[in-house]
């Protein structure tokens, strides 16, 4: 592992069944959300968890250990509040955000955008971006899904590795 410059944001590599990708955390903008994602990653919470929802040209969603899209908890208990920052927008592919069921309902689920999604701005906490492995995100985004946006063939996070 190469040394990272001091003061650079933490990163997490997600090794998936379709290859690895790495996300850079926006710790200054979303500290509680980043802390949640980093700690869950360190604990192995996301290991062997499915990407349960993939919508072409929209998002790749995962982080629910039940694989249903209805589960998952944060390190703070059940749910925690949004950290919406007006400077951060879903301007393109590779934006890492929290999935939620409405305001202040963040748990463990997250999504990565596959294209600009301005309709999500102000509704989902953006807490990072894909900094390496965008080709893996593109492959994930093109898998065949059923009529509920669930992949026909399982795609999952095999393990996560925090790079401090």
Curated annotation (Swiss-Prot):
Per the record, what are the reactions this protein catalyses?
[protein]-peptidylproline (omega=180) = [protein]-peptidylproline (omega=0)
Q: Where in the cell is it found?
A: Cytoplasm
Q: Taxonomically, which superkingdom?
A: Eukaryota
Q: Which UniProt keywords apply?
A: Chaperone, Cytoplasm, Isomerase, Rotamase
Q: What is its main location?
A: cytoplasm
GO molecular function annotation? peptidyl-prolyl cis-trans isomerase activity
User: Top EC class per UniProt?
Assistant: isomerase
Q: Give the GO cellular component terms, alphabetically.
A: cytosol; endoplasmic reticulum
EC numbers = 5.2.1.8
User: What triggers expression?
Assistant: Down-regulated by pathogen.
Which tissues express it?
Ubiquitous.
| GO terms classed as biological process | protein folding
Please report the stretch or stretches of sequence annotated as the PPIase cyclophilin-type domain: 12-162
Q: Which family does it belong to?
A: Belongs to the cyclophilin-type PPIase family.
The entry's function note states: PPIases accelerate the folding of proteins. It catalyzes the cis-trans isomerization of proline imidic peptide bonds in oligopeptides.
Question: What is this protein called in UniProt?
Answer: Peptidyl-prolyl cis-trans isomerase CYP18-2
Query: Which species?
Result: Arabidopsis thaliana
Q: What is the gene called?
A: CYP18-2
């Amino acid at each position: 592992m190469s040394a990272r410059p001091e003061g650079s944001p933490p990163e997490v590599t997600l090794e998936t069944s379709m290859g690895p990708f790495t996300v850079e955390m926006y710790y200054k903008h979303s500290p509680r959300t980043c802390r949640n994602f980093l700690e869950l990653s360190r604990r192995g919470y996301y290991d062997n968890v499915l990407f349960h929802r993939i919508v072409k040209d929209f998002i790749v969603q995962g982080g629910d250990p039940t694989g249903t899209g209805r589960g998952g908890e944060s390190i703070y208990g059940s749910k925690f509040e949004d950290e919406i920052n007006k400077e951060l927008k879903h301007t393109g592919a590779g934006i890492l955000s929290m999935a939620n069921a409405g305001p202040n309902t963040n748990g463990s689920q997250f999504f990565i955008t596959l294209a600009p999604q301005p309709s999500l701005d102000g509704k989902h906490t953006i807490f990072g971006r894909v900094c390496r492995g965008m080709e893996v995100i593109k492959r994930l985004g093109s898998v065949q899904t059923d009529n509920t946006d669930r992949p026909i063939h399982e795609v999952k996070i095999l393990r996560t590795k925090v790079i401090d």
